[in-house]
Amino acid sequence: MHPTRVWSLAATLFLVVGSMGPRLATGATRPRPRPNPPEETQAAAASPGPSPIEVRFDFEVVERYLSFEEHGGASREELQQWVRLPGNRELLRQGRTEGGLTPEILMEAVRVSLSGQEFHGPAVLGSFTAGKGALLRQLVDTIRSRQGEFAGAAAEALRPYLPVGRQFPPFTVYFHLGGSWDGRTSDAVYINLTLFQARAPQGIAGLDALLVHELFHQAHGYLFPGIDDYSSPQSGLYSLLLRLQQEGIARYLECRYIQRGGAVSDVDRINLDRYLEGLQTAPEHVTDLEAIREALRRNRTLEARHLAGQGFQSGGPLYAIGHRIAESIATVSGQAELARTLSEGPVAFARAYEQSIRSGEAPLFTAAMREDVQALRRGYGREPVRASRLRREGLALIGSQEL
């Protein structure tokens, strides 16, 4: 859910992780064409060229685990090397954030699993299911054989929303084992194959759409810095709007991708129904948005952060609000206007939405929210990265003087 450029501002700026938790899903998948809608076909025809992004798949975490299984176990040294693989970074990062998962516990999970038992660890880890090495091998081989197809489909879905000629570094997709999510994005994209393994025999159904969602986050992270700063009312509102933009557009793109493909799997149908229902029910959750805004206005920033976390947890109602905002902008003002907001930020996203509200439509922003967005545009929103850095440095100075 956020940028991949690292801003070392100690818990003020960070790489946003874009995940909705495990998508509800079962069902088989098969290769299918993804025809673009007319306006996107015209845009692609007008500006042909190489893929806008290069995607690399990394299976080392899973391959080494399968090697351990084939050899009947692993030494402590081998497990220590395995746990330090780049593909395990996000799992361990979330383990530190949520608590309960350390490298030692992850190594123990592998050891127990290799002995033929199921390891029940902290919630952030999920579970390691033993005795399914053949299925895991099948998943890896299938994904590997289709990685060009998956990467190409995601790149074409993102093409209309990326600046023409913009150069991106290669994007890496790491496949790992364990976690309470299907996909997350921070410095790279991390896909949890344990959940796909648990869907057997449906396999990799839904992976292509998930990659569209997560690779969008990766690309957006290079276009605009990620900020999660609830240290002041304005920085908190900015952070809230940015998360709405990130998750809203990611879901919008994923939803359109599924619709264009005809929702051929049960996974696609379940997710599509969920997303479309969210579009319809989003106005019912304006009160959730207002509760966060009101907490910020009263300078109850910790409460606001907590409420926002609840609203986004596991694809919660704030995803649907962001999706509806993105849908409204694209429908009324066009996809070019929605794409413009990616480089200009969340205040531009909010303003574009206000200009796209149709007559008779119940707006998702109250008058008070619109007023606060205007104030944000005049204040913190002008230089958000600098403002957060200066505030952090100022608070650190005050703290040192108090000591």
PLM feature spans:
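Acidic/His-rich structured neighborhood in mature extracellular/periplasmic domains
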Residues: S115-L272
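Pan-zinc metallopeptidase signature
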Residues: N271-L403
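Bacterial N-terminal signal peptides that target proteins for export
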Residues: M1-A10
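Post-HExxH zinc-binding segment in Zn-dependent metallohydrolases
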Residues: P48-E78, L223-I292, S359-L364, A368
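N-terminal mature-domain "stem" immediately C-terminal to a signal peptide or N-terminal signal-anchor/transmembrane
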Residues: R30-H120, A362-G379, V385-G399
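Boundary at the C-terminal end of the N-terminal hydrophobic targeting segment
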Residues: P22-G27
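Structured segments of extracytoplasmic/periplasmic soluble domains
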Residues: R64-G72, W82-R89, P160-Y161, Q218, ...
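Bacterial N-terminal signal peptides
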Residues: A10-G21
